[in-house]
UniProtKB/Swiss-Prot annotation:
It is found in: Cytoplasm. Gene3D superfamilies: Adenylosuccinate Synthetase, subunit A, domain 1, Adenylosuccinate Synthetase, subunit A, domain 2, Adenylosuccinate Synthetase, subunit A, domain 3. InterPro entries: Adenylosuccin_syn_GTP-bd (IPR018220), Adenylosuccin_syn_Lys_AS (IPR033128), Adenylosuccinate_synth_dom1 (IPR042109), Adenylosuccinate_synth_dom2 (IPR042110), Adenylosuccinate_synth_dom3 (IPR042111), Adenylosuccinate_synthetase (IPR001114), P-loop_NTPase (IPR027417). It catalyses: IMP + L-aspartate + GTP = N(6)-(1,2-dicarboxyethyl)-AMP + GDP + phosphate + 2 H(+). One of its GO terms (molecular function) is GTP binding. It comes from Desulforapulum autotrophicum (strain ATCC 43914 / DSM 3382 / VKM B-1955 / HRM2) (Desulfobacterium autotrophicum). Its cofactor is Mg(2+). PANTHER family: ADENYLOSUCCINATE SYNTHETASE (PTHR11846:SF0). It comes from the Bacteria. Its EC number is 6.3.4.4. Homodimer. GTP binds at residues 12-18, 40-42, 305, 331-333, 413-415. This is Adenylosuccinate synthetase.
Amino acid sequence: MPNIVVVGTQWGDEGKGKIVDLLSGYADYVVRFQGGNNAGHTMVVDGNEIISHLVPSGIIQNKVCFIGNGVVVDPLVLLEEIDYLDSRGIDVSPERIKISDRAHMIMPYHKSIDQARELKKGDAKIGTTGRGIGPCYEDKATRRGIRFADLLDEALFAEKVTTIMEEKNFYLKNYFKTDTLDPGAVIKEFMGLRDRLLPYISDVSVALNKGMDQGKQVLFEGAQGTHLDIEHGTYPFVTSSSTVAANAACGSGVGPGKLDHVMGIVKAYTTRVGSGPFPTELFDEIGDRLQKKGAEFGATTGRRRRCGWLDMVMLKNAARLNGLTGLVITKLDVLDGLEEIKICTGYEHKGKVYDAFPPAIKTLEECTPVYESHPGWTENISKIKDYEDFPENTKKYLDRIKELSGVDIKIVSVGPGREATIVLDNLFC
């Protein structure tokens, strides 16, 4: 039985939440393997919008959901989200949610440092959400992190927090010139959360591998997008974790040979939140139209998303980096009514045309997109249930995406709800 990884191919906000919610109906387990609560997944069920930031989207389908070792977790946010989902009538018992004992915890000092650092950068800021994700990953890399396993030993937890906060407070006071934090208060706060958290803590790697050996189907849910990847994204305007499909194995504790398919989610146009290069960004009425019709506001920050034409240089890059075996096209209906639709097929920079992503951020910032133009369609496609019922120009647009990317389209989404989805090939079946 197949195990499927779902990743974003752009800069996040591609509609992964809806697709994971849809595919979760066929999976037994759903796993989040990287990132933190700097990402938000939005699901619309029976007209009701539900947003999750840490708990995998599969919780809506009453599946067993795992938060892997590659995720950094703010325990306060996690418990707030569990309470929110519970208030919506969703089963959030420890039988449904498992947190890796090896996942790192976002501590109060991580958030203080994150916000102070961004403030100090001024105009050079990169647009972090200020939720402590980056500083937590820093501590993980330098072997100073606090993991969920540390909550099992109260004395050890207190000792580790006291030691690390001596350094963090020195940093806050002497470099950022901002308020310090009381170690005793932090320890007391987390010990107050301990009893609620302990039932959820699990060896996720063991549980997942055991389930796979028993034939359980697993869906791995990525956060953000390929071009926010710490290794392959538009560095330094990236997130602090690896967002590509290969990290599904490392970030959850399974072998890469157990990943069967990789589905790349691509919005029918391109958006980005925060700072960073964006070659196809539109500053005209079409960009405004995409933003308004697509309701392009971040689920986590509420920030207005920048909008532009579909960028095939990005998509081909994502296909290569992730080894995509299928594409999911989302928000296709947002393009309804446009007379002309453009696709970026390359970048031009000082007389040179790039058909691959340039590594130098300065080059990317100075690139001019090379476009090909396609006729749009006037019809409303949001109610269409069968691919063959699409207008001819819609089908030609989709065919061109498939041709340029070299990846087959498996699913097309024409609205926020589950029902507004056309499945061409269900890999779980």
